Structures are given as structure tokens and as C-alpha cells.
Swiss-Prot record:
Protein name: Transcription antitermination protein NusB
Organism of provenance: Thermodesulfovibrio yellowstonii (strain ATCC 51303 / DSM 11347 / YP87)
Ribosomal protein among keywords: no
Key word Transcription present: yes
Record function comment: Involved in transcription antitermination. Required for transcription of ribosomal RNA (rRNA) genes. Binds specifically to the boxA antiterminator sequence of the ribosomal RNA (rrn) operons.
Gene (UniProt): nusB
Coiled-coil zones: none
């Protein structure tokens, strides 16, 4: 449950950045750190350092790889333009794809399940199914592709 709470904070952070049109600015490391610090000041009630640490890792990793992640979303989101996607759904996909591709310590099935549950809570049932389908395809195709490339 701690990690789900952290993922919910990541969604809030990414959503706020996009609504404030800060997505490109936060690619600057110093600006990103300032924004993360401000975010935790606004969410001062969260005292659990494990939650904050995991959330920070996901935020930093997602932002660091956001261009690659967005290209992957566009590749797998058949007939959907990423710019027209629901902001919540797009950002759930972003941090989940980061987890699937760059966090081998987290089983991709766990990541997908968490993304679906968060989508059900913050978006729609249709969004949950949409996110599940995209992440499942990405996990199977990208992970299998990477494993076969390693051989």
C-alpha cells in the first residue's frame, strides 16, 4: 500500500506539472528538484520517508526518460494521439512505463495492476482497460525484445 500511495503522489506531481505547462521545464534537474521540494511542502502531511523516496525515484526517472516514454506511448496507443489523451491516463502510463522498462526490481505484473487500480480510482473504467491493454503489450513486447537482444 505504501508504494501505491507513492504512485498516487507521482500522478499528482506529473498532472500538476502538465496543467502548469512545466513538463518541459522540469527536464532541467535543478528546476525538477525545486518543484519536488515545493510539492512535498504542499503535501506536508506525508511523513513516511519510504513513500517520499519511492515517489521521488519514480518522478525523477519518469522525467529523465520522458521523451522515450512518450514515443513508446505513441507507438502502442493505436489510433490515439498522445496530445489528445486524457492527462491522468497519459501520466499513469508515463510512470508505469518507466517502472516496466527501468525498474527491474518491480515485477511488471505488479506495475500493471497498480496502474489499473490507480486508473479506476482517478479516471474511468474505460481508462483502466485502455491502460491495462497498452501496458500489457509494452511489457510483453519491449521486455521480450530486450531479452532476445541480450542473447
Amino acid at each position: 500500500m505504501k508504494r501505491r500511495k507513492a504512485r498516487e503522489y507521482v500522478l499528482q506531481f506529473l498532472y500538476a506539472c502538465e496543467m502548469n505547462e512545466n513538463t518541459q521545464k522540469i527536464c532541467n534537474y535543478n528546476f525538477l528538484q525545486e518543484e519536488i521540494e515545493k510539492f512535498w511542502e504542499r503535501n506536508y502531511e506525508e511523513q513516511n520517508s519510504d513513500i517520499k523516496s519511492f515517489a521521488n525515484q519514480l518522478i525523477e526517472g519518469t522525467i529523465e526518460h520522458i521523451d522515450i516514454i512518450d514515443k513508446i506511448i505513441q507507438k502502442y496507443a493505436d489510433k490515439w494521439n498522445i496530445e489528445r489523451m486524457i492527462t491522468i491516463d497519459k501520466n499513469i502510463l508515463r510512470f508505469s512505463i518507466y517502472e516496466i522498462l527501468y525498474r527491474q526490481d518491480i515485477p511488471y505484473q505488479v506495475t500493471i495492476n497498480e496502474a489499473v487500480e490507480i486508473a479506476k480510482k482517478y479516471s474511468t473504467k474505460e481508462s483502466a482497460a485502455f491502460i491495462n491493454g497498452i501496458l500489457d503489450r509494452i511489457a510483453k513486447e519491449e521486455i521480450c525484445h530486450n531479452k532476445s537482444a541480450e542473447k
